[in-house]
Structure formats: structure tokens, C-alpha cells
């Protein structure tokens, strides 16, 4: 089974995806980690690489290509990504969207990154604005349209263990088509 975990910065998607992958003994791939690795190799931070990516679709294509390779190769995989739910939906069995209000996400990011709450809010707003523009421009998707997701969870008042339990309960309650996934070249988009 291939499962997508999407959501905005600070929603808990990476933590949940890692824990879920461990619970299921699935492989895990993170678009955010791939993006951060690209930023580091270019000597940039995430915000500045997002700025570069606004005019250079090759950045997103590199991330997408790496994820696409995993999706076609692996049978038991958790994909963590802001936009995988939209662009890889046809290849996956279940798409889950995690979210929380801005103030909660900012608090989580401030603690995680050891920055002020105000700086975390500023970073989130900048990243989300850049993501919205870029993903609409290059992919033609509206990241506010959550209709592609099977399950949407507000992570505000649920701890990680209960979020994972909720997802596991959902997974056990649905049946999936086990036919092989079709190959498609995502670079044709």
C-alpha cells in the first residue's frame, strides 16, 4: 500500500508519517527532506530555495522525480509531502491531509527550530504564500481544495499516538484495489 501524508508546515505530517511508517514497517520518503537537501547543496535556506523555485520549475521536478521513482518501485511506502496528495494521487492507495490552525503550527515550529513564535508565524506565512503561488503556477492545483484526500485530520488537540491510531483504524476499515499502478512520466506535466 502507498500512503500519502500531506499538510502545511507545522501540521505534524513528518512526525506522523515517520511514526506510521515505523508502525507498518513501511519505507518512508520525505519531499521536505529532499527539498532541504537540495537547499543545502545550493547553500540556501528553505525560504530562499522556495524563492528560486518560484521561477525555476526544475527544483520541483527534481523532488517530484525522486518521489515518483519510489512510488513506482515500492509497494509499502509512506510519502510525506506538501503536494503529493494532488500530484501523485493516481498512484497511491490512501491520501491523508493533516492540518492545524496557524497559531498551533507556529508554536510547534518555534519549539522545533528554536526560533521565536513571531519568526515562526512569519516563516509559515511566507512559505505558504510561495507554495500557493508556485503550485498553482506550475501544477495548476489549488492547495486549498482538499477533495483529493481520503482522510483530513485536525492535529490541534490529538497527540501523535492517537493520530497514528486514527489512521491505522481508517486503513483497516477500507479495502483497496491491489492492481499494479500504471507508469506515468510526471515530467510531462
From Swiss-Prot:
Catalyses: CMP + ATP = CDP + ADP; dCMP + ATP = dCDP + ADP
The Gene Ontology CC terms held by the record are: cytoplasm
Q: Which GO terms describe its biological process?
A: pyrimidine nucleotide metabolic process
- Give the intrachain disulfide bonds: none
Q: Which top EC class applies here?
A: transferase
UniProt cross-references to Gene3D superfamilies, sorted A to Z: P-loop containing nucleotide triphosphate hydrolases
Which keywords does UniProt give here? ATP-binding, Cytoplasm, Kinase, Nucleotide-binding, Transferase
Just give the chief location class.
cytoplasm
- What subcellular locations does the record give? Cytoplasm
Extract the SUPFAM superfamilies matched here: P-loop containing nucleoside triphosphate hydrolases (SSF52540)
InterPro entries according to UniProt:
Cyt_kin_arch (IPR011892), Cytidylate_kinase_dom (IPR011994), P-loop_NTPase (IPR027417)
Q: Which residues does the record give as ATP binding sites? A: 7-15
Q: What is its EC number?
A: 2.7.4.25
Q: Per UniProt, what is one GO molecular function of this protein? A: ATP binding
* Record-linked HAMAP family: Cytidyl_kinase_type2
* Similarity remark: Belongs to the cytidylate kinase family. Type 2 subfamily.
**Name recorded for this polypeptide:** Cytidylate kinase
Q: Which organism is it from?
A: Saccharolobus solfataricus (strain ATCC 35092 / DSM 1617 / JCM 11322 / P2) (Sulfolobus solfataricus)
Gene that encodes the chain: cmk
Amino acid at each position: 500500500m502507498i500512503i500519502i501524508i500531506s499538510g502545511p508546515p507545522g501540521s505534524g505530517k513528518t512526525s506522523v508519517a515517520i511514526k506510521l511508517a515505523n508502525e507498518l514497517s513501511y519505507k518512508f520518503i520525505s519531499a521536505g527532506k529532499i527539498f532541504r537537501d537540495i537547499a543545502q547543496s545550493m547553500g540556501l535556506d528553505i525560504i530562499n530555495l522556495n524563492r528560486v523555485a518560484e521561477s525555476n520549475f526544475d527544483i520541483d521536478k527534481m523532488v517530484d522525480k525522486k518521489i515518483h521513482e519510489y512510488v513506482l518501485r515500492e509497494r509499502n511506502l509512506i510519502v510525506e509531502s506538501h503536494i503529493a496528495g494532488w500530484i501523485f494521487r493516481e498512484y497511491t492507495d490512501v491520501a491523508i491531509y493533516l492540518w492545524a490552525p496557524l497559531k498551533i503550527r507556529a508554536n510547534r515550529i518555534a519549539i522545533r527550530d528554536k526560533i521565536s513564535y513571531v519568526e515562526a508565524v512569519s516563516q509559515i506565512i511566507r512559505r505558504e504564500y510561495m507554495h500557493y503561488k508556485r503550485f498553482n503556477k506550475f501544477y495548476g492545483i489549488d492547495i486549498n481544495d482538499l477533495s483529493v484526500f481520503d482522510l483530513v485530520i485536525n492535529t490541534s488537540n490529538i497527540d501523535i499516538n492517537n493520530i497514528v491510531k486514527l489512521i491505522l483504524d481508517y486503513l483497516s476499515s477500507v479495502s483497496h484495489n491491489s492492481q499494479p499502478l500504471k507508469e506515468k512520466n510526471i515530467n510531462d506535466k
